[in-house]
């Protein structure tokens, strides 16, 4: 008898997995109830299935899909995403006036609707809106999501990309590819999202789009080539040249709303031809049709170039690069045209769900973007609104109507769609129905982020896979200043339901409520929101690192739990071995001859889960352990599920402590940018923290250092950096990996833990 318990911890899943669309958080070869199921691993394989689905689509469904784009705006923090989105809304007529991030008019950008966002000048929550864009006498409907750039709010990017078909990656013309740009690229790959790239801030001193494109090719490892050349640079930026059709585009009017076409300036003609040749050459490397034209020495037509860009972009083999300045109102309209020309419509993306079988197994099923098919939708984001919980839903198949009923797949409950809205930041507009490929929101539904809904009476029980949720790396204790903590509990319940990376638990030993998250800013924002939205002042403890415990060598165990001193006894014996593994924790049994009944083995698996939550060394979670039980013994009277669960606890501790255990600490990727004159101070500061410098890039005015530092050493770093750079330096942190602590640190942590435990007795 063999049973395997998987998925207890997912911290060490490879971060560069290529995941199938919407079966999008299991690996390309997935084990479902011990049945191996092959899914498409490349877009070419996906395209075969997509073409088969499209052959059976009705003309109305094809027409609706052709005019629809679901896109996200993603980038490193301060690259200008929200400013870019504000221009998109203005040029599409969605808003009547432009307001800046942290603007002087106290209005702020439309998509940053929280007071905290407008005060701090950062995006905290992803905000959804929709708009229309006219091109070639056709009107296209965009569902648009602006996402945060700060790594602490990475879950907002995850859930946006989870339901989008394409994205605009915004890159700073001065800083180029930065740490969070790499993170966003990894997230796009995780969900197979094609992108067009916009190099922003071309009006800034030191802007260099060609260096940025080189970095996209080198650091993001995706072929990229410019489809535009800037007219002027820095403060003299006037417009761009479209190198495909060789036309100069100038933004005119008080807010760049008018586009004037003209001949290419004489001094740019040679550069345009050089970049056009490079574009064609790059496309020939990633597109077969363009390769044939290129090898035959022919000059491709404008339509052939555009078609090749579209095929290669949707196939995730290439990203076209545009350039301009959102703040200076230059080049935005060209990006909107490129969204239409090069990013996929819903019927060009393969969306896969899992059909639940009667025997409990799951079978992949490809969804059809048709409004006549049974409804399938995913709740990808929850938000507390003025009328109760607001649930954002992506419709993958069928249509959703106001007043209709749908079934919550996880619970089987029938729920009524009492109100259906399209969101425009924090404003909402009621609609009667939405079709396949659309994004909408509804009220009054009790669900969690990642839950699937299907149409009432649908024969197939289909579920969509959930999004990737990174592990929390930092924790702190929190308590309300007043004893009346009803509002405090309500806030805790709401926020952890809305944000999967915000975790709350009660420590029974310290009698404290502990909150965990992605970084100091992440937790600071929630503490501030509890105060503002619930009127509860909180006392917080010092931030604590979320350590992990692991083993380094195999260890055998033979443990007997025996309590036979009169009355009902307890007896359970387990024999086996424990091994270190690099993947998630794993529990396995290989019992021959039924020496231990199945119900007791299940109790052993529960005991294993118990032990993972609190390791033997310092009480932190355990990582990378494979526990195998291959023998044991029962007592005809005294054996029970409790006895074997307790025996597993003892065996785990015995084997763990004999396996040369280590304490792991989070290592962060740190990127610091500051003026060149402070380079020595910054490098010295990182060395003082015990950091390892990986790369240094010097620009005309600023330099950027990338390093690896332990999270524990980074507390208070912002204060030290301000002092070292006269307040002119900035930095970003991202979790990189877990690594063993120094022996003296491990010894100190164990001693402190043992001392604290002894004090509680």
From Swiss-Prot:
Binding site for GTP: 75-82, 146-150, 200-203
Record field: transmembrane: none
Primary residence: mitochondrion
Transit peptide stretch: 1-33
Pathway in which the depicted protein is active: Protein biosynthesis; polypeptide chain elongation
Keyword DNA repair: no
Compartments, as annotated in UniProt: Mitochondrion
Superkingdom of this protein's organism: Eukaryota
CDD domains, per database record: EF-G, EFG_III, EFG_mtEFG1_IV, mtEFG1_II_like
GO biological process: mitochondrial translational elongation
Keywords: Elongation factor, GTP-binding, Mitochondrion, Nucleotide-binding, Protein biosynthesis, Transit peptide
SUPFAM superfamilies given in the database record: EF-G C-terminal domain-like, P-loop containing nucleoside triphosphate hydrolases, Ribosomal protein S5 domain 2-like, Translation proteins
UniProt cross-references to SMART domains, sorted A to Z: EFG_C, EFG_IV
GO molecular function: GTP binding; GTPase activity; translation elongation factor activity
Pfam families listed in its UniProt record: EFG_C, EFG_III, EFG_IV, GTP_EFTU, GTP_EFTU_D2
Annotated GO CC locations: mitochondrion
Segments forming domain tr-type G: 66-347
Protein family (similarity comment): Belongs to the TRAFAC class translation factor GTPase superfamily. Classic translation factor GTPase family. EF-G/EF-2 subfamily.
Role noted for this protein: Mitochondrial GTPase that catalyzes the GTP-dependent ribosomal translocation step during translation elongation. During this step, the ribosome changes from the pre-translocational (PRE) to the post-translocational (POST) state as the newly formed A-site-bound peptidyl-tRNA and P-site-bound deacylated tRNA move to the P and E sites, respectively. Catalyzes the coordinated movement of the two tRNA molecules, the mRNA and conformational changes in the ribosome.
PANTHER family per the UniProt record, alphabetical: ELONGATION FACTOR G, MITOCHONDRIAL
Name this protein carries in UniProt: Elongation factor G, mitochondrial
Annotated source species: Candida dubliniensis (strain CD36 / ATCC MYA-646 / CBS 7987 / NCPF 3949 / NRRL Y-17841)
Gene encoding the protein: MEF1
């Amino acid at each position: 008898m063999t049973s395997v318990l998987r998925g207890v911890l997912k911290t060490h899943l490879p971060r560069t997995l290529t995941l199938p669309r919407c079966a999008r958080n299991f690996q390309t070869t997935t084990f479902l109830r011990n049945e191996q199921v092959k899914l498409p691993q490349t877009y070419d394989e996906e395209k075969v299935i997509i073409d088969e689905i499209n052959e059976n689509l009705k003309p109305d469904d094809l027409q609706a899909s052709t005019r629809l784009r679901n896109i996200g705006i993603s980038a490193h923090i301060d690259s200008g995403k929200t400013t870019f989105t504000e221009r998109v809304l203005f040029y599409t007529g969605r808003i009547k006036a432009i307001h800046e991030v942290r603007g002087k008019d106290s209005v702020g950008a439309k998509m940053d609707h929280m007071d905290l966002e407008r005060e701090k000048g950062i995006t905290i929550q992803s905000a959804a809106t929709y708009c229309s864009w006219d091109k070639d006498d056709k009107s296209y409907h965009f569902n648009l999501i602006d996402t945060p750039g700060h790594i602490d709010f990475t879950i907002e990017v995850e859930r946006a990309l989870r339901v989008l078909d394409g994205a605009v990656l915004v890159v700073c013309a001065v800083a180029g590819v930065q740490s969070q740009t790499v993170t966003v690229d990894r997230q796009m790959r995780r969900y197979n999202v094609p992108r067009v790239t916009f190099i922003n801030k071309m009006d800034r001193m030191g802007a260099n789009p060609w260096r940025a494109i080189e970095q996209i090719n080198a650091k993001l490892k995706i072929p990229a080539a410019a489809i535009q050349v800037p007219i002027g640079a820095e403060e003299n930026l006037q417009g761009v040249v479209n190198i495909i059709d060789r036309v100069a585009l100038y933004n005119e009017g008080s807010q760049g709303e008018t586009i004037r076409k003209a001949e290419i300036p004489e001094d740019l003609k040679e550069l345009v031809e050089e970049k056009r040749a490079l574009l064609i050459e790059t496309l020939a490397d990633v597109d077969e049709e363009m390769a044939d034209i290129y090898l035959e020495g022919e000059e491709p037509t404008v339509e052939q170039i555009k078609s090749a860009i579209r095929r290669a972009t949707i196939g995730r083999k290439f990203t076209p690069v545009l350039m301009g300045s959102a703040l200076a109102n230059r080049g935005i309209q060209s990006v909107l045209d490129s969204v239409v020309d090069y990013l996929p419509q819903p019927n060009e993306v393969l969306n896969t769900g899992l059909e639940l079988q009667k025997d409990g197994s799951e079978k992949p099923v490809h969804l059809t973007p048709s409004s006549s098919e049974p409804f399938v939708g995913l709740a990808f984001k929850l938000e507390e609104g003025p009328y109760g919980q607001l649930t954002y839903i992506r419709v993958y198949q069928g249509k959703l109507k106001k007043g209709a009923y749908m079934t919550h797949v996880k619970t089987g409950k029938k729920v009524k769609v009492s109100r259906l809205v399209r969101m425009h930041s924090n404003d909402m507009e009621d609609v009667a129905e939405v079709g396949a490929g659309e994004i909408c929101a509804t009220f009054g539904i009790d669900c969690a982020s990642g839950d699937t809904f299907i149409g009432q009476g649908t024969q197939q029980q289909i579920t969509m896979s959930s999004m990737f949720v990174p592990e929390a790396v930092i924790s702190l204790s929190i308590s309300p200043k007043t004893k009346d903590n009803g509002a405090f509990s309500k806030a805790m319940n709401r926020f952890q339901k809305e944000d999967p990376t915000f975790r709350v638990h009660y420590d029974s030993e310290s009698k404290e409520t502990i909150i965990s998250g992605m970084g100091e800013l992440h937790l600071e924002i929630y503490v501030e929101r509890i105060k503002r939205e619930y009127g509860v002042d909180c006392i917080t403890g010092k931030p604590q690192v979320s350590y992990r415990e692991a083993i380094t060598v195999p260890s055998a165990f033979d443990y007997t739990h025996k309590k036979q001193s009169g009355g009902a006894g307890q007896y359970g014996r387990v024999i086996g071995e424990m091994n270190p593994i690099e993947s998630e924790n794993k529990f396995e049994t290989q019992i021959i001859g039924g020496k231990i009944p199945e119900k007791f083995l299940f109790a052993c698996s529960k005991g294993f889960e118990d032990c993972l939550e609190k390791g033997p060394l310092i009480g932190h979670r355990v990582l990378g352990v494979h526990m195998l039980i291959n023998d044991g013994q029962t007592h005809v009277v005294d054996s029970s599920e409790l006895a074997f669960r307790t025996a597993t606890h003892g065996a785990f501790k015995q084997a763990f402590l004999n396996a040369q255990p280590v304490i792991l600490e989070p290592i962060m990727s740190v990127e610091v940018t500051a003026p060149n004159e402070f380079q020595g101070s910054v490098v010295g500061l990182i060395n003082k923290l015990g950091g390892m410098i990986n790369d240094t890039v010097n620009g005309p005015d600023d330099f950027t250092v990338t390093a690896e530092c332990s999270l524990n050493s980074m507390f208070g770093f912002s204060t030290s950096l301000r002092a070292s750079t006269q307040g002119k330096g900035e930095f970003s942190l991202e979790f990189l990996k877990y690594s063993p602590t120094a022996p003296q640190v491990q010894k100190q942590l164990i001693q402190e833990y043992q001392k604290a435990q002894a004090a509680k007795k």
